[in-house]
Amino acid sequence: MSKKTPQAIRGTQDIFSADAEAFAFVVETFERVRKLYRFRRVEMPVFEKTEVFSRAIGETTDVVSKEMYSFEDRGGDSLTLRPEFTAGIARAFLTNGWQQHAPLKVATHGPLFRYERPQKGRYRQFHQIDAEIIGAAEPQADVELLAMADQTIRGLGIEGVTLHLNTLGDAESREAWRAALVEYFRAVASELSEDSQERLEKNPLRILDSKDRRDQQFLADAPRIDAFLSDTARAFFESVTTGLDAAGVKWQRAESLVRGLDYYRHTAFEFIPDEGSEAAGKLGSQSTILGGGRYDGLMESLGGAPTPAVGWAAGIERLAMLVGGAGFDPPIVVLAEHEHLFDTARLVVQALRLSEITAEAEFRYRRTNKAFDKFKKTGTDVFLVVDQVANLNGSHQIDIRLSGVLPDEEEELKLLAKRVELSLRLFFPDLIPKADPEKQAISWYLSRK
C-alpha cells in the first residue's frame, strides 16, 4: 500500500476558515430570503438517469456532449451526476405529482458537477443556490422571482450589480426570429468562427452570445427580437418591466442576452457587476453572478404536459468571493488569568453562548499573553479576561474584564458590554459593574469570601 497522501481531485476544493464562513453566509442569506418569499425547500438526488439531462438540456449542448460526469451502474443504467438543478426539479415535479401544488415555488442549494476547465470562481464540483416557480404563466411570477434574486444579492451586501433583461418572445416570435437569424448569418457563414458555423443550423441564437471577434463584427446588424414579437409577447415583457419598476428592482435591456434551447420563452436575465465596480474587479472575466429565464417548454421534453415555469441559479463560490468577511462574526475569547479560574472562565463562555453571543475558550489553561498572541493571529480582537483580586479584609473578588478593538470602538464596545452583562447575570446574578475612571476597559466583579 502506498504511503503517499492522495491529493484533492483537480477542479475540487477544500473550503476552510474565512472562505467557509463566506460560503455559509451566502447559504444563510438565501435561506432567509427564501422563507420571506415562501419558497418551499426541496432536496434533490445528486445523480439522475442520464436521459433526464440529455432530454432536458439538449443532446447538442456542451453540457451534455462534453461536460457531464456519466457512468453505468451495476444494473446497466446510465446515470449522471447532476450538472444543474432545473432538470431534476422538473423530473420530480412530474413523477411525484407536484402538479397539485401549482403554482409551486421551490428552492434548493447544493453541489453540482461539470467537467470543464477550472478557473477563477469555477470548479468541476461547484455549488449553487436555485429558485423555481412552476405552473405560473403570469408575468408577475417572473417579477416575484427577480425581486427575490435582487433581495438575495442586496442581503449579501453586494453592490454595483445590475439586472440585465431581455425577452425571447413566445414560440411564434422565437421561430420567426430564428429563421431571420439563420438567413442573416448564412450570408457570412464562411467568415464566422468554427463554433458559430456549427451553431448556425442547430442553435443560431447562441451566435449572438459569442465572444469571438470573428463573430462580433456581425452582431450589431443582426436581426433583433423586437421586430418579431407578437402582441402577446410584447405585452408580457412590458408587464415584467412595469412590475420590476414597481418593485424597485433596477434593470437594463440587454438585447444580446439569449438562451439557446427551444423550450425557453419570454424572459431571460442575468445579474452582472457594473463595469469598474468592486464586484467586477473581484470576478474578472467570470462576470455573471446569477442567471435564469422562463422555460415554458421544458416539461414536454420530459414527457409531461405543457407547463409554464421560470427559474434562476447562482454560484455560491462566486457570490462568496464578493461578500468578503461579511459572514464572519469574530468571537469573544474568554481567558483565565490563573489556572484555578479556568472553570469559571468556562462558565462565562457558556453564559455568552446561551445568550447567542459567539464565544470561544481554550481547552486547557494557557498564560494569557500566549493566548492573546494565538487568537489575535486569527483576527480576534475582543477578549474577556477572568482575574482574581485580593481585598484587605481577606476576601477576594473575581474580575471579568472586557477589552478589544472594534471598527467604532467606543460605541460598539458599549453595546457589546450591555449584551455581555445581561448574559453573565444568567450564572452570576450578583455581578456588579466596576467603575473604571481611566476607561482602559469595561469590567465587572463578583465578591467572594
Swiss-Prot record:
Question: Which InterPro entries does this entry report, sorted A to Z?
Answer: aa-tRNA-synth_II (IPR006195), aa-tRNA-synth_II/BPL/LPL (IPR045864), His-tRNA-ligase (IPR015807), HisRS-like_core (IPR041715), HisRS/HisZ (IPR004516)
Q: Name one GO cellular component term.
A: cytoplasm
The entry lists its GO molecular-function terms as: ATP binding; histidine-tRNA ligase activity
Whether Nucleus counts among this entry's keywords is no
Q: Which SUPFAM superfamilies match?
A: Class II aaRS and biotin synthetases
Top-level EC class: ligase
Name used for this protein in its record = Histidine--tRNA ligase
Give the keywords, sorted: Aminoacyl-tRNA synthetase, ATP-binding, Cytoplasm, Ligase, Nucleotide-binding, Protein biosynthesis
Which Pfam families does the record match to this protein?
Answer: tRNA-synt_His
Subunit-structure text: Homodimer.
Tell me what reaction this enzyme catalyses. tRNA(His) + L-histidine + ATP = L-histidyl-tRNA(His) + AMP + diphosphate + H(+)
Where found in the cell? Cytoplasm
The family line of this record is: Belongs to the class-II aminoacyl-tRNA synthetase family.
Q: Name one GO biological process term.
A: histidyl-tRNA aminoacylation
The EC number(s) given in the record are 6.1.1.21
Gene3D superfamilies from the xrefs? Bira Bifunctional Protein, Domain 2
